[in-house]
Amino acid sequence: GANLPDQDRVFNNYGKFFMEMSRRSKEGIPTISVVFGNATAGGAYVPGMSDYSILQKNAAKVFLAGPPLVKMATNEDANDEELGGAQMHSSISGVSDFLAKDEKDALEITKNLIKKIKQPADNKYKSDASSPKFVKDEIIGIIPSNLKKRFDIRELVKRFVDSSEFIEFKENYGRTMFCCWTKINGYPIGIIANNGVIFIESARKATHFIQLANKSNTPLLFIHNTTGFM
């Protein structure tokens, strides 16, 4: 790459790229980043600034500097997976919204996202309703009599949404908050439901999801079973 003192001339228009991403996001034009390999230095900002980020497991790496530079600067030993691997960004930093198993899975996730983006819940976008695959009466057996006891909110959602299908957002990050896109009676909606004690990461996840729902004009359903805050 270019010498550091010369980067103001080599990458003099790079900031404009980030500005355009922010501007388009504000105008409701989303950006989807799909990372199959290394996104380093300036490229590391792109997934973080995108509305939706998909990282491939055991392949995607997102960091400003790799292990050699970290070793030189701090004398610390770290591998690339710890610094910016897909698993780390999906469970710890929250940069990744979706963790794909492989390239095919990443592209499938991308296709599903494109289908649901910019679909306001009016008659124009209403699809045929379909019944849940699970029996609704089972809801009574899922919710415990002790309201302070945690239960898997996904099992509840599966019993009232169309076809019992949903697209979960940041599945491995802030796991005590469940966020998903789905349909009820043919109408697209988003669901936010806490899945236990609400931690900081859980709150950040919900905030990000609400912002995305506002941009796509998607109504939200909130399901509460808060057992505590941390």
Residue ranges and their predicted role:
Residues 1-5, 71, 134-141, 152, ...:
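Gly-rich Lys/Arg/Thr-decorated short loops/hinges at beta-loop-alpha junctions or inter-strand turns
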Residues 98-157:
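Terminal amphipathic helices with adjacent charged low-complexity linkers/tails
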Residues 8-12, 49, 54-56, 142-151, ...:
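Short low-complexity stretches enriched in small and charged residues
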Residues 5, 18, 63-65, 70-74, ...:
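Generic, ordered loop/turn and secondary-structure boundary motif
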Residues 1-122, 226-230:
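Conserved catalytic cores of soluble enzyme domains
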Residues 72-77, 94-101, 142-151, 194-198:
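Short, exposed beta-strand "edge-strand" segments with a Pro/Gly-rich flavor and a Y/T-containing core
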Residues 149-230:
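Non-catalytic terminal/interface segments that mediate subunit docking, oligomerization
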